[in-house]
Amino acid sequence: MKRLPATTVYYGMELLLSMPTFIVVAVYLVRDLHFSPLQLVLMGTAMEATVFLFEVPTGVVADTYGRRLSLIIGFLGTGTAWLLVGVVSSPWLIVGLWGLWGLAHTFQSGAYEAWITDEVGTERVGPVFLRGARFSYVGAILGLVALVALGTQSLRAAVIAGGAIEIVTALACIFLMPETGFRRRPAAERKGAFTELRMTWHTAARFVRAAPLLLMIIGIALVVGLSSEAFDRLQEAHFLRDVGLPTSGQFPAVVWFGAFAVVAMMFGFFVVGALQKRFERSGTGRIAKLLFTFTALLAGSQLLFALTGSPVIAIGAVLGVLIARQVMWPLWLTWVNQQVTDSSVRATVLSMTGQADAIGQAAAGPVLGVVANAYGISSGLAVGALLLLPALGLYARALRHGGREPELEELPAPSS
């Protein structure tokens, strides 16, 4: 079977894999299985702990043996985890499945962005990321409508369907996904499997230590991870147990949460479209400025959501958080990929940023869960919002120096 062009496959995966299964999962766990705030946060902690342990090793696998293989394994694993979450009912089994999801996700993280960057080149990947984001919004909206429609009848069935879609996507990638940009070491230079993996890791580590902006990017990823876990795990519970949802029409909760996501994605679609038109004229400093702006919106909206008791204001705040995240992601991917000039370690370096985010989430998750249990969900959300503030300082530092860190640039590059 003839393989498709890389951009066609990438846009197709953005369309199919953007189905927001996590929305119906969150409502299912709170409404049907009655998870406590601590259990919800522990799920995230289990996921992030596995990401912390395996993010970089699986990135090394992708750089050593191929990004396509890594992605297929990852899609099969995350799809299986979603499907089983819809089958079992034990809280601790579900916590374990969240850990499995995290492990499978590490095979995707880094490898996904590295694959398309190598296929199209660093000079073209920025517009591809932005256009892919627009495909993901369309796929998410269509998928959300389908999942919400199914979820109003059975949340369990909607969760299972979301997992099945990922498994089907993995099987399609086996036959349709190309890989022409990746070059494995020549057979004459290959050594044992563990030796090859270790060589890739050491090369990536030296590259990061010698790249000042990458060190700062990893710091930002750590701070964002510290902040995000509270909102990711507690936003639905905050609405359902504290703030309440509008009663007009008596819509089920899953419909409301689906509507929030749809509105945010529609805004994101048009904002990203506007950015795409002038993106090729934007340098690193311009991207950092946009990231600073949307990070400020993210922090302010998350804090407002934590403190308000009004359903209307809470909805506006959640939309602010979701819109900021929608727009920031393709900008972040482009900014990071611009700094990774060595294709042979691209997936590993990208995985390092993912590992920093996971460390932040795993470290902050249990603490914020205890705060939410002891002092209320709003307190956990507020602390999470305040933890985002150091990221603004790091972005501001990058802006003052045109996207570079001059003090670090004076350090000598490590010898090989």
Regions found by a protein language model. Name each.
Residues 1-52, 212-261:
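Helix-loop boundary and gating motifs at the non-cytosolic
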Residues 50-53, 256-280:
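Transmembrane alpha-helices of Major Facilitator/SLC transporters
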Residues 51-89:
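Conserved MFS/SLC helix-loop-helix module at the cytosolic interface between two early adjacent transmembrane helices
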Residues 98-137:
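Cytoplasmic helix-loop-helix junction between adjacent transmembrane helices
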Residues 157-175, 379-397:
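Symmetry-related core transmembrane helices of the 12-TM Major Facilitator Superfamily/SLC fold
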Residues 162, 170-189, 397-409:
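Helix-loop junctions on the cytosolic side of multi-pass membrane transporters
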